[in-house]
Amino acid sequence: MEHNGSFRVDSEFRYTLFPIVYSVIFILGVVANGYVLWVFANLYPSKKLNEIKIFMVNLTMADLLFLITLPLWIVYYYNEGDWILPNFLCNVAGCLFFINTYCSVAFLGVITYNRYQAVAYPIKTAQATTRKRGISLSLIIWVSIVATASYFLATDSTNLVPNKDGSGNITRCFEHYEPYSVPILVVHVFIAFCFFLVFFLIFYCNLVIIHTLLTQPMRQQRKAGVKRRALWMVCTVLAVFIICFVPHHVVQLPWTLAELGYQTNFHQAINDAHQITLCLLSTNCVLDPVIYCFLTKKFRKHLSEKFYSMRSSRKCSRATSDTCTEVIVPANQTPIVSLKN
């Protein structure tokens, strides 16, 4: 653990914001992603999963890995940025944060490319055996990102800073960079470059998909519902990227420069923006399951059946209650015949 007594800006609103946002995301994310896994486990035999469903299962696993660390971050921010847990848990939380972020980017990228191929080259895609490719690509993504993230497990990512009143020290987690560190700057530049490369590829593929769907001759168009769902899927993937990932990566490099001491004029404003983008980044765990509704027919059918059965049970419950009210009358009065049909 390093002692860092140098002045750093802080955004104190995060100690209220993060516990609330992370608590909501934890509850919704665990329910949504747990349900997705349950659906895949019960409706799809593992040997019959095609390429895109393999990517979806892996994306769900990446989201769950991050979600299990949220209680650690909630405790951290509730204690106003003091890591009171064992130091190794800070490393684990940071490692899984990195894995979730870039596995999500990678799997959303390959899902988009899969849909691009299906629209741009439908015959070739229909004839291709994609299950093995899906497994191979998933392994490559996991191995490369986990290997990169393992760096966080090998180093102590905590540091000591004075508390507000100066009476002692508190332990920060992933909040310290060596001043003017060139290697750290190079790493962040490389990460930003890779992210925006993937983002522009996804943006291009989605534009091609939208253009193809909107300009198909009437005789080649599928049913209106299928086309509408395909367009919604494209819009949802773009929305997840633009809402969750783009703001963080736009702010991350200027924030890194400020933290390293290269640019301090707008340090406070950049730090405030960085906290907000971290919240937005975590919402991908809740938004990812929405994509599955537009990608998988069985998933939509199962979800609509469950929703219909819940509505039916409520109606039956109300009908039973109304029936009981009509039947139970005082003994000295003549029952009134209901006019309901």
Curated annotation (Swiss-Prot):
A Pfam cross-reference name: 7tm_1
Cytoplasmic compartment residues: 39-54, 114-133, 206-233, 296-341
Keyword RNA-binding attached: no
Localisation per UniProt entry: Cell membrane
Glycosylation sites: N4, N169
GO biological process: chemotaxis; inflammatory response; inositol trisphosphate biosynthetic process; phospholipase C-activating G protein-coupled receptor signaling pathway; response to lipopolysaccharide
Positions of transmembrane segments: 17-38, 55-74, 92-113, 134-155, 185-205, 234-254, 276-295
Keywords in alphabetical order: Cell membrane, Chemotaxis, Disulfide bond, G-protein coupled receptor, Glycoprotein, Membrane, Receptor, Transducer, Transmembrane, Transmembrane helix
Principal subcellular localization: membrane
Expression tissues: Found in a range of organs. Expressed most strongly in spleen, followed by skeletal muscle, lung and small intestine. Expressed at moderate levels in the heart. Expressed at relatively low levels in the brain, liver and kidney.
CDD domains to which the protein is assigned, alphabetical: 7tmA_PAFR
Bridged cysteine pairs (disulfide): C90-C173
InterPro entries assigned to the protein according to its UniProt record, in alphabetical order: GPCR_Rhodpsn, GPCR_Rhodpsn_7TM, PAF_rcpt
Induction: By lipopolysaccharide (LPS).
PROSITE patterns (alphabetical): G_PROTEIN_RECEP_F1_1 (PS00237), G_PROTEIN_RECEP_F1_2 (PS50262)
Record family assignment: Belongs to the G-protein coupled receptor 1 family.
Complex formation: Interacts with ARRB1.
Protein name: Platelet-activating factor receptor
Organism: Mus musculus (Mouse)
Gene name per UniProt: Ptafr
